[in-house]
Amino acid sequence: MASQGTKRSYEQMETGGERQNATEIRASVGRMVGGIGRFYIQMCTELKLSDYEGRLIQNSITIERMVLSAFDERRNKYLEEHPSAGKDPKKTGGPIYRRRDGKWMRELILYDKEEIRRIWRQANNGEDATAGLTHLMIWHSNLNDATYQRTRALVRTGMDPRMCSLMQGSTLPRRSGAAGAAVKGVGTMVMELIRMVKRGINDRNFWRGENGRRTRIAYERMCNILKGKFQTAAQRAMMDQVRESRNPGNAEIEDLIFLARSALILRGSVAHKSCLPACVYGLAVASGYDFEREGYSLVGIDPFRLLQNSQVFSLIRPNENPAHKSQLVWMACHSAAFEDLRVSSFIRGTRVVPRGQLSTRGVQIASNENMETMDSSTLELRSRYRAIRTRSGGNTNQQRASAGQISVQPTFSVQRNLPFERATIMAAFTGNTEGRTSDMRTEIIRMMESARPEDVSFQGRGVFELSDEKATNPIVPSFDMSNEGSYFFGDNAEEYDN
C-alpha cells in the first residue's frame, strides 16, 4: 500500500474516523455493524416478523432500502419540490414477505421516513451513523455486481463490454462517501468522468458560473480518486493531464477510455469489503454478541465466521436452483464478483460456476411476480477456508503491474497467476499514440506488452483454516495455470436497470 502515512485504512473511511490504531478501528467498525443489527431487530419487532421471516434475505433488503431512502436528503428534497402522483415524499416502504398457511404472501408496507430515521438513530446511540448507511449501500452494490451485467452502460459511454471486470461499485449512489469511493473499480470512475465530460460538451453552461465551479471541484476530486487507484507513474501522469484540462472534451474521453483499457493488465487498486445483509448482523446481536466489545473487521476472518453461524433464507422461483442462488449471495457477501473462479471455488469449498451457467435470477422479487408458486430455501453461505481481502489488484513486483485476464479484479490475497488474453487486450491499442499524452501512452503500452499471463501474483499468500484465528498456517493452493476463471464468461444475465 502506497504511502500509508497519508492513506486512511478503509475501516477508517467506513467509520469516518481520523487515524486510529487497530483496536480502535475494530471497535468502531464493530459499533457500526452492531448498530445495523440493533436497527434490524427493532424493525422486525415493529413489523411483527417471525424469526423465519426475519431471516429472509428479501425482507432484509426491503428494510435496508427503507432506511437508505429515509436518509436520502437530496432525493427527499427533490420529491418535496416536484410532487409526483402517487408518491408521498414523507413515506417509504416496500414488499414484506410473510409465511401464511404454508404459503408466502407479499404485503406492501408504508412507513413515515421520520419514524424510520428515529428507529435508526435510536439503534445507533442517537447518531446519524452514516457509516452504517454506506455499509448497506456497499452490500447492495456488491449484490448488483454479482447479479447484473452492465454491458449497456459500458457501450453507452463508448467502452467495451469486455471491460466488465472494472465495473465494481457501478451502482453505488453518489452519496456513498470515501468508503464508497474505495470500492469503486477503475471502469466505474472512468464512466462517471466520461458522463461529466459529455454533459460539458453538450451543455455550455455546465462548467460556468457558481454551479460550474462546484462541478469543476467535483470533477477534479473524481480525477484524483481515479488517479489514486492507478499504480504506475505513466497512468497517474495521464490522469493529471485529464484533471488539468482547461475545457474537458473528446481528447479527455479518449484518454480515459485508454486508461480503462490499460487497467485490464495494469490493474488498479480497488478495495474489497465483506458487507453482509442487515439480518445477519441482527441475528448475531439477537444472540447476545457484542460487536463493539469483540471488535469487527470487514477484511479479515470476522465475516467468514459470522456467515459460518448464520442461517439465512431466500425466496426461490419455481425453476431456480437453490445452490445457484446461494452462490450469488455468497459472492455478494465476499465482494467476489470479479474474482477468479478458481480462487473462489477453493475458498468456498464447492465449485463456483460462471454466471452464464447459473439457473437463478436476481434476489429481489418484482411486484408483478406470482407469489403462489414461490418457495423458500436456506442459503448456503459457509466457506471451507478463509482468505485475507486485498486491494492491490495483484500486480507482480517486477513491474508493479502484471497480467490481468479480461475479467479479474482479485478480491482475496491468494497466490495464483492472473491469466489473460493478451492479443484481445492489445488489439484495442492500435493507432493513436500521438498528442500530448503520447509518451505516457507509449510507456503504458510497453508495460502491458511485457506482462506475462503466467506470472504469479500474491507470491506465498494462501488461505487459512477457519479455526486458524491468527492466520499462522497459510495453505497455498495450486491452480491449473492454463485454466482461467472468469465469472462473466458466456454471460446471459439481465441488465441492471434502476
From Swiss-Prot:
GO terms for cellular component: helical viral capsid; host cell; host cell nucleus; ribonucleoprotein complex; viral nucleocapsid. Keywords: Capsid protein, Helical capsid protein, Host nucleus, Host-virus interaction, Ribonucleoprotein, RNA-binding, Viral nucleoprotein, Viral penetration into host nucleus, Virion, Virus entry into host cell. A motif (Bipartite nuclear localization signal) lies at residues 198-216. Pfam families: Flu_NP. One of its GO terms (molecular function) is RNA binding. A motif (Unconventional nuclear localization signal) lies at residues 1-18. Its main location: virion. GO terms for biological process: symbiont entry into host cell; viral penetration into host nucleus. Disulfide bonds: none annotated. Late in virus-infected cells, may be cleaved from a 56-kDa protein to a 53-kDa protein by a cellular caspase. This cleavage might be a marker for the onset of apoptosis in infected cells or have a specific function in virus host interaction. InterPro entries: Flu_NP (IPR002141). It comes from the Viruses. It is found in: Virion; Host nucleus. The keyword Repeat does not apply. Transmembrane segments: none annotated. Coiled coil: none annotated. Residues 1-21 are annotated as: Disordered. Belongs to the influenza viruses nucleoprotein family. Homomultimerizes to form the nucleocapsid. May bind host exportin-1/XPO1. Binds to viral genomic RNA. Protein-RNA contacts are mediated by a combination of electrostatic interactions between positively charged residues and the phosphate backbone and planar interactions between aromatic side chains and bases. Encapsidates the negative strand viral RNA, protecting it from nucleases. The encapsidated genomic RNA is termed the ribonucleoprotein (RNP) and serves as template for transcription and replication. The RNP needs to be localized in the host nucleus to start an infectious cycle, but is too large to diffuse through the nuclear pore complex. NP comprises at least 2 nuclear localization signals that are responsible for the active RNP import into the nucleus through cellular importin alpha/beta pathway. This is Nucleoprotein. It comes from Influenza A virus (strain A/Duck/Hong Kong/7/1975 H3N2). The lineage of its organism: Viruses, Riboviria, Orthornavirae, Negarnaviricota, Polyploviricotina. The gene is NP.
